[in-house]
Amino acid sequence: MKKIAMGLLIFILSVPSLASSGVGIVKDEDFRAVGVSQENIDKVKTIITEASTQYKLKTLDKKALEIEINKYILDGTEKNLDKLNELVEKVGIVDAEIIKDRLKYQIEVQKYISTDQYLKARELSLEKLTKTQQKQ
């Protein structure tokens, strides 16, 4: 069950942008078909948008730290070792914050759409995609 929940979280957070009428490949109608209210779907979309924004910001912070690390490496690793160690610690903190955020947003999403509902809705979407591809 933990693997399914983590898979759900990774899928949801890896979606760079929301579809206009769904979450990733799963459409609103598929969520409604498995018993999720439109209000809950809208709340999940809001959570995912916030999660995506936070992830992008923290990723930018991490990249900025990595650029600074590279600058100090080019300037001389040995003489900048203390500063490099400090920056590496900061990168670790940002990585930990990203993981904590994923867990936080997963908990928030599961308040509105259960793992079972998501998996059933996803299966409906995949069936529709398969039928559409077979027609072409």
Regions found by a protein language model. Name each.
Residues 4-16:
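Sec-dependent N-terminal signal peptides
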Residues 29-112:
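Amphipathic alpha-helical segments
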Residues 25-26:
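Myb-family helix-turn-helix DNA-binding modules
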Residues 20-21:
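Boundary of Sec targeting at the N-terminus
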Residues 107-123:
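Long amphipathic alpha-helical coiled-coil segments
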Residues 4-5, 47, 133:
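Residue-level detector of intrinsically disordered/flexible regions characterized by low predicted structural confidence
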Residues 119-136:
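Short, low-complexity, Pro/Ser/Thr/Gly-rich segments in the mature regions of secreted, periplasmic
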